[in-house]
């Protein structure tokens, strides 16, 4: 049985959805017997957009929008293929972007 280090990076606009997904991943990994480090909270990225309200005049009247991207990192230092298969079968919400990086093995 080959052990590997697995990094799971989660991104979402909704932090409640992101925290619930991280909790589910940690729960499944611990049930499988893996040691879990995290979730590590990364600084949120805020993208701001400012547009004119009218189509061609009145520059003083503007609308402001922002998108907040939240990130979490979960690492499994000694994971085997059974844990990886359990994580791959996990159903996560549509608003969560998942990147899995496997190192070693």
From Swiss-Prot:
<protein>
    <recommendedName>
        <fullName>Small ribosomal subunit protein uS10</fullName>
    </recommendedName>
</protein>
<keyword id="KW-0687">Ribonucleoprotein</keyword>
<dbReference type="GO" id="GO:0006412">
    <property type="term" value="P:translation"/>
</dbReference>
<dbReference type="InterPro" id="IPR001848">
    <property type="entry name" value="Ribosomal_uS10"/>
</dbReference>
<dbReference type="InterPro" id="IPR036838">
    <property type="entry name" value="Ribosomal_uS10_dom_sf"/>
</dbReference>
<dbReference type="GO" id="GO:0005840">
    <property type="term" value="C:ribosome"/>
</dbReference>
<comment type="subunit">
    <text>Part of the 30S ribosomal subunit.</text>
</comment>
<dbReference type="GO" id="GO:0003735">
    <property type="term" value="F:structural constituent of ribosome"/>
</dbReference>
<comment type="similarity">
    <text>Belongs to the universal ribosomal protein uS10 family.</text>
</comment>
<comment type="function">
    <text>Involved in the binding of tRNA to the ribosomes.</text>
</comment>
<dbReference type="GO" id="GO:1990904">
    <property type="term" value="C:ribonucleoprotein complex"/>
</dbReference>
<dbReference type="Pfam" id="PF00338">
    <property type="entry name" value="Ribosomal_S10"/>
</dbReference>
<keyword id="KW-0689">Ribosomal protein</keyword>
<dbReference type="GO" id="GO:0000049">
    <property type="term" value="F:tRNA binding"/>
</dbReference>
<dbReference type="InterPro" id="IPR027486">
    <property type="entry name" value="Ribosomal_uS10_dom"/>
</dbReference>
